[in-house]
């Protein structure tokens, strides 16, 4: 059984393509017009142990908001599609990841109730073309469209780059663990996720 998805989202503002295989560790390629965002997406997908291609074109390059939001939407839909009925998945995971001064906790539930609660103290306003206000927005848009309940909390740290990168690493590791097949059951008292 291959759990994969190929999702394209095209609007008047952007064109986003995501090819994702969550069961096969392989090449990760990311191309967006935002260098630091590329770095974070590669980090996320690498720590998920996935094969992925993410391509993003900004048709109206006002700023980074549209690209960040539309990549989050498309990646979230790809994960939701790849997981299908979610039969057998572990469903829950949490990770606490250090990166030098930064320590970040991520806890998630693949619940089909997409929402995010993000508590990060990002002091720099921009890194490598990415407005840091769009980092929580990425996590919120991703969670909503993937159907994942997501909590991200900074436990310590002062370096904005380290805090953001620890968040993406922790999310990748948590997604890897929560999407693993552990049996043939639907992990819910309702019988459906």
Curated annotation (Swiss-Prot):
GO terms for molecular function: imidazoleglycerol-phosphate dehydratase activity. Transmembrane segments: none annotated. InterPro entries: IGPD_sf, ImidazoleglycerolP_deHydtase, ImidazoleglycerP_deHydtase_CS, Ribosomal_Su5_D2-typ_SF. It catalyses: D-erythro-1-(imidazol-4-yl)glycerol 3-phosphate = 3-(imidazol-4-yl)-2-oxopropyl phosphate + H2O. It comes from the Archaea. GO terms for cellular component: cytoplasm. Its EC number is 4.2.1.19. GO terms for biological process: L-histidine biosynthetic process. Its main location: cytoplasm. Pathway: Amino-acid biosynthesis; L-histidine biosynthesis; L-histidine from 5-phospho-alpha-D-ribose 1-diphosphate: step 6/9. This is Imidazoleglycerol-phosphate dehydratase. It comes from Saccharolobus solfataricus (strain ATCC 35092 / DSM 1617 / JCM 11322 / P2) (Sulfolobus solfataricus). The gene is hisB.
